[in-house]
UniProtKB/Swiss-Prot annotation:
Gene label: rplO
GO cellular component terms listed in the entry, alphabetical order: cytosolic large ribosomal subunit
Name listed for the protein in its UniProt record: Large ribosomal subunit protein uL15
Region of interest called Disordered, as start-end residue ranges on this chain: 1-56
HAMAP family (UniProt xref): Ribosomal_uL15
Skewed-composition ranges (Gly residues): 23-35
Amino acid sequence: MKLHELKAAEGSRRVRNRVGRGAATGNGKTSGRGQKGQKARSGGKVRPGFEGGQLPLFRRLPKRGFTNINRKEYAIVNLDQLNKFEDGTEVTPALLVESGVVKNEKSGIKVLGNGSLDKKLTVKAHKFSASAAEAIDAKGGAHEVI
């Protein structure tokens, strides 16, 4: 057997369906697009949300709310993620980014009380939930808002 004699396994490769190549192919003339109309034309499609001229849902529903331009989004760190640091470490936002616990600092770091903390740490962050602050202090550590 030589390289030019290699053949793909039977049924492993599907033949591309060529449309508009004569009536005998079963896909000639209209090429599977049916008769006239918008979807039969080249480039003919309706935009997402178009309902055939009926007032679309996104226009029937009232406008609501606004986007606060001063909104702050905090990167979230849970207590169980802080266990990866050594006992007595001072955990800062820079250390969290460097160690890969947080990918993007965003508007700051917020520590939440999910999971349990096993180590005594000094944690510096922009915000703390009440349960997180309580858990850090209970282990003999300290929390500091920066």
